Amino acid sequence: MIVQNIEITTLSNGVRVVSETVPYVQSVSVGLWVGVGSRDETDPVRGITHFIEHMLFKGTPTRSARTIAEEIESRGGMLNAFTDKEYTCYYAKALSEHVEIVMDVLTDMLAHSLLDPEEIAREKNVVLEEIKRYKDQPEDTVHDIFAQTLWKNHPLGRPIIGTSHTVSSLTREHIEEYMQTHYTPDKIVVSVAGNVTHAEVVELANRFLGSISGPPYKRRARKPQPSGNSKTVRRRTEQVHFCLGGQGFSQKDDDRWVLTIIDSVLGGNMSSRLFQEIREKRGLAYAIGSYAVSYTEGGIFAVHGGTSPQTFSQVLELTTKELENVRKNNLTEDEVMKSKTQVRGALVLSLENMSSRMMRMGRSMIHFGRVIPLEDILQKINAVTHDDIDRVANQLFDGSTLTLAAIGPLEKDAI
């Protein structure tokens, strides 16, 4: 039995506080989660969620940008943030004795950022350089091209970073209006894991966030529909980078755990079928693997890799062959058992890291409004059967519905 001391409190203004007390460690990981991501953006302000994440590090009435970093780092801690398609997270890790200053700094950033026009102009240049750097990395951009092609015209298909045009056009008024709409108490989750009590966390959250206000915001639900299209981007690179896949499952669909097992067998690790066949046995690629991602209303499954233009067709053929093999239910009992053990082990091992515990709770609160017990997840993984795998593989791996995205020195009709 895995014992987790998780408690949840909702403040009077709607801010949710979740904590896990782990008395045998000396650290604490704190995350401020906001239930807003790139999927919530309109076309004219694409990239604004990510841009706001940058701006919240640029100073408050009582702290400069440098002071924000120094107050955490001078105590041996670390401070960072990330933007996803459905949420944004500002987080820090430090010794548990510094939990008060960590909460003070993070909440000050969230609630009192200056959004100085000069800083906005300067940070635009930073993000524009980030976009250029990103475009120079085809092994990364191919994933966005894949999502855009798979989910054409759906906000989940948009790149998180935005475009050079939309980022250049952002104004302080855009940012303030967006934050007033989305950075509301009902969308905020304070997630804390480490050597700290729930009462301490609630007191700090009340002190620093208890007075913020704003009307609740309800995201418009719209399930993404797969296009079945493919796309080639011609570029003078040494390799062809590709993603082949399609629709996965939402966060609330238990078939996501069936797909997790399939993913592990196909390309989730070094002992997977694709890694062994394409890299180890044939030496056709350095990077080859697969992934499954779940969102509120849908999900993605994809095989990704990079190979020379001359061997791209062969790698693609081997990949589709393995997908078809899984459709024909040729996974062995041993493969399924090992995959279940691997997935369960990775989940349990993640509990040794306070940041992983904090992130698991934060994501669960954003998606479900509660923390799904780890025992429940482990039971769902154990319950996956060969019939489940056969059913899901037949549903997802139909070659006529798959989407392929590729970047490299290819002709337009290469796929």
PLM feature spans:
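Extreme N-terminal starter segment of soluble prokaryotic enzymes
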Residues: Q4, V15-R16
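Charge-rich, well-structured scaffold segments of protease-associated domains
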Residues: Q4-N5, T10, T21, A65-K223, ...
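Active/ligand-binding-proximal structured segments within catalytic/core domains
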Residues: G14, T21-I72, Y183, D254-L266, ...
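Catalytic cores of enzymes that engage adenine nucleotides and/or redox cofactors via long glycine-rich
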Residues: P224-S227, E277
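Residues that act as N-cap/strand-start positions at coil-to-secondary-structure junctions
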Residues: I2-V3, S227
